[in-house]
């Protein structure tokens, strides 16, 4: 990253449950897809964040026994909204996702930048998308 590019805290938003049938291996794959974008963002000088990094440990500590139970719902989406209030931007990746779309809508309400490709992000010109 050049010294002229401002470092941004960027929330990487993509599908988590969508299209998985809540199958654990598919949920893990969706988190990994978001994580694939974290390293290029970091190397470009930004602070990448995936909401699941914060939400999932808290959901477990809250005693959730299955996705969508009361403990899960208490934490999973609300923490994303709290996190957004402290971010500079959102990178929306992947396919259909009501949750990720809600994060984008909230980001726009907060006046945050919303990106859909790495190349749109300052300092990321020429970086190949990890996942097409």
Predicted features by range, described:
Residues 1-132:
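Catalytic phosphate/metal-binding cores of nucleic-acid and nucleotide-processing enzymes, i.e., regions
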């Amino acid at each position: 990253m050049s010294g002229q590019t401002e470092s941004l805290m960027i929330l990487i938003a993509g599908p988590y449950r969508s299209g998985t049938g809540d199958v654990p291996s598919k949920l893990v794959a969706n988190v990994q897809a978001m994580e694939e974008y974290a390293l290029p963002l970091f190397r470009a000088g930004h602070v990448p964040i995936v909401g699941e990094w914060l939400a999932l440990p808290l959901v477990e500590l809250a005693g959730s026994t299955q996705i969508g139970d009361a403990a899960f719902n208490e934490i999973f989406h609300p923490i994303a909204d709290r996190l957004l209030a402290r971010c500079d931007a959102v990178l929306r990746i992947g396919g259909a996702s009501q949750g990720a779309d809600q994060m984008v809508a909230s980001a726009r309400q907060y006046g945050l930048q919303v990106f859909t490709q790495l190349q749109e992000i300052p300092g990321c010109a020429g970086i190949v998308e990890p996942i097409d």
